[in-house]
From Swiss-Prot:
It comes from Methylobacterium radiotolerans (strain ATCC 27329 / DSM 1819 / JCM 2831 / NBRC 15690 / NCIMB 10815 / 0-1). Keywords: Cell cycle, Cell division, Cell shape, Cell wall biogenesis/degradation, Cytoplasm, Peptidoglycan synthesis, Pyruvate, Transferase. GO terms for biological process: cell division; cell wall organization; peptidoglycan biosynthetic process; regulation of cell shape; UDP-N-acetylgalactosamine biosynthetic process. It catalyses: phosphoenolpyruvate + UDP-N-acetyl-alpha-D-glucosamine = UDP-N-acetyl-3-O-(1-carboxyvinyl)-alpha-D-glucosamine + phosphate. The active site is at residue 126. Cell wall formation. Adds enolpyruvyl to UDP-N-acetylglucosamine. This is UDP-N-acetylglucosamine 1-carboxyvinyltransferase. InterPro entries: Enolpyruvate_Tfrase_dom, Enolpyruvate_Tfrase_sf, MurA_subfamily, RNA3'P_cycl/enolpyr_Trfase_a/b, UDP_GlcNAc_COvinyl_MurA.
């Protein structure tokens, strides 16, 4: 199993290109099932999750083609893919495929909307009553779907097509909003989503669907209106920049020190996180086509955060920010309100010398003068990259095991950091 070795202490200086957002690319790829024409997606990151979804779509009969590189493209600048669902042969998504990635459950929406039926495995580990897919199922039922749970599968049918309806989500759900957008795009009549997710990735999906012929208004606000159409067309769409990757590298610079331009990204995608970083002492400025992050000397100020749905502080940056706070001057409080069990990185950061105390959904971080490298183990995607950030600032060598988690969400991480002066290498098993 691959490992990453980091020798800490080197500041980061240079330019890091930001990839297309995985969390936007996944629903965009799934939306290809809504039409028999070709959907061309530009700036799709090369990630394990993208490859997994490609296999899942292929199981349904979707043709996949990677377009040749344009002049100046590298393996770090994303890929252009063409997806054509003109010959869908199967509306069943089996457990062995869906279990590799939870987002793949979303195929239930376009399959049901276009073909009138779908049989999709529940993601692994879902217990009745606490399934994270409950709100997605609720949205489809509001649109007229007949749904039953049978032997671990969600079986969805509609006799005469989906019908527009008002869907009021009891809590903000990105997945539920994605599913409702795709299903309602081909429903009869008008659908209104209340308390819809406002994330940039939701806006990106709506913009792509509109290019395909959908009629969606209000994406990016809590109220979205979708006027259903009879069919959707092919389209060409560029995936928006990855705000989580942007914030991750910004926090790496804030922790290790240095001067880095994050290019091909947008500050408006993560204002809350950048504002917090500025408060810690990092200097954040917008430059043409990107963001410049500097921290040359001076300590790291302790700052309290609470994770919230967009436009609040992203839960997907919580672990990275906690790594930064381990070297802050004073005490910081980090409250996680989006997901349970999202403090799995705490005990691994402690192996590097961090002082963190947990009280329910609150982590209390006492800043220390230094971290010291040690062997650590990645437990999930965001936790794994928080260990990378900590390792960059720690004294000595940090060895990160189970780095396959990183490959799910960070494209060419070692190459991007290495070119900015980080002493980082992957040791292949």
């Amino acid at each position: 199993m691959d490992r990453i070795h980091i020798t800490g202490g080197a500041p980061l200086n240079g330019v890091i290109p930001i990839s297309g957002a995985k969390n936007a690319a996944l629903p965009l790829m799934i939306a290809s099932l809504l039409t028999g024409e070709t959907l061309e997606l530009i700036n799709v990151p090369r990630l394990a999750d993208i490859a997994a979804l490609t296999r899942i779509l292929g199981n349904h009969g979707v043709d996949h083609m990677v377009v040749g590189k344009r002049p100046g493209q590298t393996t770090e600048t994303g890929q252009t893919i063409r997806l054509t669902a003109s010959n869908v042969i199967d509306t069943t998504a089996p457990y062995e495929l869906v279990s590799t990635m939870r987002a793949s459950f979303w195929v239930v929406a376009p399959l049901l909307a276009r073909f009138g039926e779908a049989k999709v495995s529940l993601p692994g580990g879902c217990a009745i009553g606490t399934r994270p897919v409950d709100l997605l199922i609720m949205a489809l039922e509001r649109l007229g779907a007949e749904i039953e749970i049978d032997a671990g599968y969600v079986v969805a049918r509609t006799k005469n097509g989906l019908r527009g309806a008002e869907i009021a989500f009891p809590k903000v759900t990105v997945g539920g909003t994605h599913v409702a957008l795709m299903a309602a795009a081909l429903a009869y009549g008008t659908t209104v989503l209340e308390n819809a997710a406002r994330e940039p990735e939701v806006v990106d999906l709506a913009e792509c669907l509109n290019k395909m012929g959908a009629k969606i208004r209000g994406a990016g606000t809590p109220r979205i209106e979708i006027e259903g159409v009879a069919r959707l067309n092919g389209a060409r769409h560029e995936v928006l920049p990855d705000r989580i990757e942007t914030g991750t590298y910004a926090m790496a610079v804030a922790m290790a020190g240095g001067d880095v331009v994050l290019k091909d990204t947008r500050a408006d995608l993560l204002h809350s996180a950048l504002d917090v970083l500025s408060t810690t002492g990092a200097e954040i400025t917008q430059v043409e086509g990107g963001i410049r992050v500097r921290r040359n000397g001076g300590g790291i100020a302790a700052v309290d955060i609470t994770t919230d749905p967009f436009p609040g502080f992203p839960t997907d940056l919580q672990a990275q920010f906690m790594a930064l706070m381990t070297l802050a001057k004073g005490q910081s409080h980090i409250r996680e309100t989006i997901f349970e069990n999202r403090f799995m990185h705490v005990q691994e950061l402690a192996r590097l010398g961090a002082k963190i105390r947990l009280e329910g959904d609150l982590a209390i971080v006492e800043g220390v003068d230094r971290l010291k490298g040690a062997p650590v183990m990645a437990t999930d995607l965001r936790a794994s990259v928080s260990l990378v950030i900590a390792g960059l600032a720690a004294e000595g060598e940090t060895q990160i095991n189970r780095v396959y988690h990183l490959d799910r969400g960070f494209e060419a991480l070692e190459a991007k950091l290495g070119r900015c002066g980080a002493q980082i290498e992957r040791v292949r098993a």
